[in-house]
Amino acid sequence: GTFVYDCPEPASEPQEILKNMDTPESRTKVLEAEVNSVKEYLASLSNDDLQRPSACVDWSVADVLAHLAGQDHAPRVRRGLQGDYSPEEGSPAVADHDEDQFAKNIFNRALSTREQHGDQLLSYLAQRLDEVVEVFNSVGPNDWDNLCYWPPGPMAVWTLLDQRIAELTMHTWDVRSVL
């Protein structure tokens, strides 16, 4: 037989989508829309849903959501906007970056965030998502290239914005794909 992929027409032309994402300010609107969608989705999750395995190997849905909640994008961007891209207290110097330790820290921070917030994890995540939208909406037109601390090396504010969109999209899929 013949395989036919029936795909509805896109809501807008691909070029229009690209044009709409060509500035950090427009990508901030993408982040805001994604955050609103994710928060609406989170409100539909049950405690049983949170205990299920996610698409991330050895991580439950709650672990993935705790990972998203435990990321420190907003404070790092705030500091970067003030010209400070040095490591926060307790964070390693860029010169001392170890990728294996970085991965372990991500894992441990997710578990710690999950344990710390327990039954309030979803509301904490929603709060953190609102915080990151607020900080990116506060970036002035000449501040997108400001550097922010990132363990492997300083990153521009706009890079952290793109990273946050990618992380949120990817990890939301990790959850939605199994529920």
Model-derived features: positions:
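An N-terminal domain-cap segment
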Residues: M21-H67, P75-V77
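Acidic interhelical loop/turn segments
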Residues: A43-S54, D130-L160
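Amphipathic, well-ordered alpha-helical segments in soluble domains
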Residues: E34-S37, Y41, Q71, R128-E131, ...
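Short, contiguous alpha-helical
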Residues: Q51-H97, Y149-L179
